[in-house]
Amino acid sequence: MVSTSQGAYQTNPSENKKALSSLWEFVMRNDFTTKRKLDNSKQAKVKSDLSSVDLPKLTVVFDLDWTLIYASKQKLFPAQQRLASGKCFVAIRPHCITLLKIIRPLCNIMMFSAGTESYVKDVLTLIDPNGEYFDKILSRNSCTNVHGMWAKDLAKTGADLKRTVLIDDRRQSFLLQPNNGIPIRPWTGQEDDTELVKMEKLIMELIDEKNVCEILKLKYNMERIEV
């Protein structure tokens, strides 16, 4: 029983329950807070999608020898295949083809080797026989001699350098653009090697970064590494 003073509005408890129940149903049907959160979430997603559309594709540039393959003049283990030229035997690094297939729809893929043009083309008949993975091939004649060392000038790729990475086992390759470099352990034929699996994970982390140089500088600090 609700006590009332003079002039107060007297209510019935059962009517109060009905009124509160109706009010609660109204709130649940029209959850303005949730709608506002959903609207904000949708707007954020649209902005995110738009920013991703505006970004050029990430360009991934691979070195060849000791990064994707191992070559030797004599056959050292069963996985090696003789090149068509007959000059050497080549084995493809574990997970190489899988990596190329995974990132192909997401990235521009290029090859930048310090090997001769004829050698690189010969090796690519094993890695990419149908020409489906690599958008551009650069070889020794595109390298830059810096104090007697072959450096790779990524400006020659024609790609946006803020959205370009070079994966290479040789540190001197990064001399001209150190903050675009991703060092990888050289491969000499180990069957249990998983370096390219690690590269896949890193590439995926960089896919939507506006400036990969900032990330790679913090991660590797290649500017301070002596070659």
Model-derived features: positions:
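Short, acidic loop-to-helix structural element flanking the phosphoryl-transfer center
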Residues: 84-110, 144-155
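Substrate-recognition element of Asp-dependent hydrolases with the DxDx(T/V) motif
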Residues: 96-125, 138-140
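Metal-dependent phosphoesterase signature
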Residues: 69-93
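Loop/turn segments within WD40 beta-propeller blades
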Residues: 51-56, 103-106, 158
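Generic beta-sheet signal
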Residues: 58-60, 109, 164
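Non-catalytic pre-domain segments flanking phosphatase-related domains
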Residues: 1-62
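Asp-based phosphoryl-transfer active-site loop
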Residues: 52-73, 169
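C-terminal cap/substrate-recognition subdomain and adjoining C-terminal extension
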Residues: 118-227
